[in-house]
Amino acid sequence: MFALFLCIALASAKLGIDVSQPTSTSSFTCLRNKGFTTMVIVRAWKSTGSFDTNAPQTLKNANAAGFSIENSDVYYYPCISCGNMAGQVRTFWQKVGQYSLKVKRVWFDIEGTWTSSVSTNQNYLMQMMNEARAIGIVHGIYGSKYYWGNLFGSSYKYAYASSTPLWYPHYDNSPSFSDFSSFGGWTSPSMKQYRGDVSVCSAGVDYNYKP
């Protein structure tokens, strides 16, 4: 009975992918045929502090393969050493308009190496997120309990966590939230990246799940 329940749960799970490299229509079609049909997330801002000019065509390819705009997001990886966190967000949003990107949500990627000061990191985070809110960007946050604690302190709670979707990584190859542990003010996630750096369908992707 448990095995049957598990099969039904996996069959009804909503699976998708995220990509950081140019990806063709044929690759997206192949991925959809493998069951990754719910969402696609494309990198649009790089850690070098520049717009990813591959994003517009990759999104077009995803749309051509059957991913609707409603199911198409982008992610934003901030450049910490560049400073001017609010300015980066403004420049990014100008590029989104310039390239006429049609996406549902922007995910702000919170990981990696920032500064050695948690207070500085907290300030950088709020500069970035306050600018996104001021502009009116529909957004969420990508982050893990591990990086959150390292960057901001384990007790730090994001002021807008209750109204901001959370996408978290845990590479346990399990499309479920059974492993989630609260952090940063979030008591439940919206999406999980459950497997990373997969080579499939002539593309490099990460696997994602949402209920």
From Swiss-Prot:
InterPro entries: GH25_Enzymes, Glyco_hydro_25, Glycoside_hydrolase_SF. GO terms for cellular component: cytoplasmic vesicle. Its EC number is 3.2.1.17. Residues 14-211 form the Ch-type lysozyme domain. It holds the Pfam family Glyco_hydro_25. Optimum pH is 4. CDD domains: GH25_Lys1-like. Keywords: Antibiotic, Antimicrobial, Bacteriolytic enzyme, Glycosidase, Hydrolase, Signal. One of its GO terms (molecular function) is lysozyme activity. The keyword Transit peptide does not apply. Residues 1-13 form the signal peptide. It is an enzyme of class 3 (hydrolase). GO terms for biological process: cell wall macromolecule catabolic process; defense response to Gram-positive bacterium; killing of cells of another organism; peptidoglycan catabolic process; signal transduction. The active site is at D18, D109, E111. It is found in: Cytoplasmic granule. PROSITE patterns: GLYCOSYL_HYDROL_F25_2. Has antibacterial activity against Gram-positive bacteria. No activity against S.aureus. Does not appear to have chitinase activity. Belongs to the glycosyl hydrolase 25 family. This is Lysozyme 1. It comes from Entamoeba histolytica (strain ATCC 30459 / HM-1:IMSS / ABRM).
